[in-house]
Amino acid sequence: MRHCAFLFRLFLIGYSCSVYFSACTQASSLKEPADELPRAEQWDSDGKRILQADDPEHIPTEERGITQNLSPAVESVGKVKASKMAVPKSVISKLNPVNWVKGTWAALKKGFKALQLG
């Protein structure tokens, strides 16, 4: 039993180290693409601003209408409140990962006590 617990701890340590180091290397390798660098505004000889392809003024009216119709729906998503009885508390408590750790710890304690008594 102790051998299995030791191997499990080694696995957790190795896994957490691999996740930690892979996150560090991924974050350091990310570079800002040249397309997304801030651009200086361009002006023509008449003093009018030259529109870029991604400017909101340059987007066709059909596409602008689509985004305007979607924005109220997106804003209302956060405002919708579900009733408290939508999901029973027993299901919520089973889905909580903190309770999984507590339950596993309690089961391990019971197992160790049973081994010591037996």
From Swiss-Prot:
The RxLR-dEER motif acts to carry the protein into the host cell cytoplasm through binding to cell surface phosphatidylinositol-3-phosphate. A motif (RxLR-dEER) lies at residues 49-64. Keywords: Host cell membrane, Host membrane, Membrane, Secreted, Signal, Virulence. Residues 35-66 are annotated as: Disordered. It is found in: Secreted; Host cell membrane. The gene is RXLR143. GO terms for cellular component: extracellular region; host cell plasma membrane; membrane. Secreted effector that completely suppresses the host cell death induced by cell death-inducing proteins. Residues 1-18 form the signal peptide. Residues 35-65 have a biased composition (Basic and acidic residues). Belongs to the RxLR effector family. It comes from the Eukaryota. This is Secreted RxLR effector protein 143. It comes from Plasmopara viticola.
